[in-house]
Amino acid sequence: MNILFWGTPAYAVPTLDALHGAGHTIVGVVTQPDRRRGRGKQLVPSPVKARAEELGLPVFTPERIRRDDDCKAKLAALGADASVVVAFGQILPKDVLEQPPLGSWNGHGSLLPRWRGAGPIQWALLEGDQETGVGIMAMEEGLDTGPVLLEQRTPIELLDTSIALAERLSALTAELMVQAMPLIEAAGTGPEDERLAKLNVRVQAEGSTYARMLEKQDFQLDWSASALSIHRKVMGLHPGAFTQLHDKRLKVLRTEPLIERLQDQLSTEGRSLVGQWPTGGHPPGTILAMIEDLGLVVSSSGCPLLIREAQLEGKARSTAPALLQQLKATLGDRFGEV
């Protein structure tokens, strides 16, 4: 098949590689324009653009595809059979979606209709979902509302970070998209409703949830919340969740709630950490213990939380005992106090 690929972040690269490796002709790659990054504010290409150039593929970088008629004309001239979209970063207009005769297909990182929108992986972790997955969806004008052709599920582990989960879902998306292509090709051209009927797609049920864009305040830890809620924020927003200790900002990178289901791995010198520090009587965010080879035990609602890895403002990320030395904290100090 002749495929026009749309994608931007590293998450999309495995799908591009998989389609290319499966023998499909990638007639073009559409990605977001280069952005200025880092201290030097140098222009940096997207991971998809960098990979496409390594593969010798033509690349297009429209600032706003909806308004770029010149780019639309160039893409139409490529003669793609289908468009494949994975985390492109712009909403595609109807005329672009309907251009390829075999349709436009999206690899989405959730079990639709749960977590439509731009941050499904983060929100699945934040809300404590037990499983998630990926779906190959026929695209339409609505945001992630199209019928689903293929879907694959995966469990969410308590200690998964958003980065680890994204890597799993990215690989699943690549596998599933390769499986989808011969099915889409076999359905042939013609009216969309007839093609989709041949493919026996699943129309999304009611009861959708929306993965809204995250804002700065979402990343700040609230120590009055439950240990599980704080842990989910740390893992779901990795590596961006933060707190304060006195006048310093601390990025919290890895935590473990001191709960029974983690009892076997939460031990030191053969003694379980679970149940050692009742939180009653301690204000939220209070440092209850500093364990040299593990980290800090901090009070929260319900049970304490173990901070295993963090990054103090102006320092490199670190684990115990270096973290304890950098913080210069004492028992009874409180996170969240400025």
UniProtKB/Swiss-Prot annotation:
It holds the Pfam family Formyl_trans_C. (6S)-5,6,7,8-tetrahydrofolate binds at residues 110-113. The keyword Protein biosynthesis applies. It comes from the Bacteria. One of its GO terms (cellular component) is cytosol. It is an enzyme of class 2 (transferase). The keyword Transferase applies. It catalyses: L-methionyl-tRNA(fMet) + (6R)-10-formyltetrahydrofolate = N-formyl-L-methionyl-tRNA(fMet) + (6S)-5,6,7,8-tetrahydrofolate + H(+). Keywords: Protein biosynthesis, Transferase. Transmembrane segments: none annotated. Its EC number is 2.1.2.9. GO terms for molecular function: methionyl-tRNA formyltransferase activity. InterPro entries: Fmt, Formyl_trans_C, Formyl_transf_N, Formyl_transf_N_sf, Formyl_transferase-like_C_sf, Met-tRNA-FMT_C, Met-tRNA-FMT_N. HAMAP family: Formyl_trans. Belongs to the Fmt family. PANTHER family: METHIONYL-TRNA FORMYLTRANSFERASE (PTHR11138), METHIONYL-TRNA FORMYLTRANSFERASE, MITOCHONDRIAL (PTHR11138:SF5). NCBIfam families: fmt (TIGR00460). Attaches a formyl group to the free amino group of methionyl-tRNA(fMet). The formyl group appears to play a dual role in the initiator identity of N-formylmethionyl-tRNA by promoting its recognition by IF2 and preventing the misappropriation of this tRNA by the elongation apparatus. This is Methionyl-tRNA formyltransferase.
